[in-house]
């Protein structure tokens, strides 16, 4: 039995699974075939449990397809073996691979940047910007952010490993910054002397400008290239800043060559960031790119309940559901609304009920209901897909019309409080089962198609802004 068996499995899994799933869970596996047993080695227990739970059946089916009655037994283990590396590593992206830094190399610790002599900077340490309050433990996981959290967790456990760089993207207030800090805290927890730097992209630009003004560009380079992990928020602000992009390009390459972790966030997919050089956007995708979507209803409720618990506030479940049903755009908006409710309750001494929330959030709820209507959804979707609203209401079944119609129905269910029959009536008198089918179809396509996933996220962001 040839060792190419696992390579055949990899090829099939690559074709069958969404690219993000394959990169996150299958690519890190290493394989060893001996004594009619195929041993799969996962980098940590988390990956092992996930693969065994989610993909065991897929792998067994492939082994049976390729080998029939001679299919090997499957065994999972945590770790790796030197002999395994060459035979089981999946194909890498088509870019020049950079070599790992020699094991004996010791990086000098980043010291206070010499280009900034302000009093505030004098107290600076290279990890002071990592917020200890943002951890994986208090990050509420749901379907919308599950992959992003799992990838971030693996990076924290194994910085500089499989997912480098890690690129997280999604709308404002969805938890990207929280995950950046959580990774930083995770790395520091495992290695207290780790050199972890978190910053907004504009700070990188400001530091570079100061370095140029003070003729200290070499110190600037040494500082940023000596970290163990560089976490940069809102990378889209590099747009049209050519000198900053040039310097970051070389910093990026140096960090990758030294197996130093890079994590970036943006409000959009890398290739959609305007004003950033193609060579940078290409590098952003070298590791793993994961979207964070607006939280679904159950996650929004869980976020509210956890936030209330952190504030020692008893929040009735029906109240959390009431708020979550009406405020859908992002986590920050949810937490802001809850803070407002809590403050009002403290000031007035009243119990938190649905009627009390209606009163405390009266203007916010009224604005939401005014902004997100079925009519508004139909107009926005029609404009997005460059069709007419009349097409959405018509009986036409061509894909160019049917898919936008399904998208609009799914958005109406997600963003309004209308029932399925009411939504159907608003779309040319369609039956509620048609609406239900549309919602399920869009949910399925969001799992299978990056384009549909992006369309849904973009439309929600537009309608919620």
Curated annotation (Swiss-Prot):
Single Gene Ontology MF annotation: lipid binding
Q: Which domain of life is it from?
A: Bacteria
GO BP terms: DNA replication initiation; regulation of DNA replication
Q: Which Gene Ontology cellular component terms are annotated? A: cytoplasm; plasma membrane
Keyword Protein transport carried by entry: no
Specify the signal sequence span.
none
Where is this chain primarily localised?
cytoplasm
**Which residue intervals make up region (Domain I, interacts with DnaA modulators)?**
1-84
Q: Domain III, AAA+ region: where is this region?
A: 129-345
Q: SMART domains in the record, alphabetically?
A: AAA, Bac_DnaA_C
Pfam families, per database record:
Bac_DnaA (PF00308), Bac_DnaA_C (PF08299), DnaA_N (PF11638)
* PROSITE patterns the record matches: DNAA
Annotated spans, Disordered: 91-120
Domain IV, binds dsDNA: annotated segments: 346-465
Question: Is the keyword ATP-binding in the record?
Answer: yes
Q: Which UniProt keywords apply?
A: ATP-binding, Cytoplasm, DNA replication, DNA-binding, Lipid-binding, Nucleotide-binding
Q: Which residues bind ATP?
A: 173, 175-177
Region Domain II: start-end pairs: 84-128
- List the subcellular locations: Cytoplasm
Record remark on domains: Domain I is involved in oligomerization and binding regulators, domain II is flexibile and of varying length in different bacteria, domain III forms the AAA+ region, while domain IV binds dsDNA.
Please explain the role this protein plays, according to its UniProt record: Plays an essential role in the initiation and regulation of chromosomal replication. ATP-DnaA binds to the origin of replication (oriC) to initiate formation of the DNA replication initiation complex once per cell cycle. Binds the DnaA box (a 9 base pair repeat at the origin) and separates the double-stranded (ds)DNA. Forms a right-handed helical filament on oriC DNA; dsDNA binds to the exterior of the filament while single-stranded (ss)DNA is stabiized in the filament's interior.
Q: What protein family is recorded?
A: Belongs to the DnaA family.
Q: Describe its partners and assembly state.
A: Oligomerizes as a right-handed, spiral filament on DNA at oriC.
> What's this protein's name?
Chromosomal replication initiator protein DnaA
Its taxonomic path starts at: Bacteria, Pseudomonadati, Pseudomonadota, Gammaproteobacteria, Enterobacterales
Source gene? dnaA
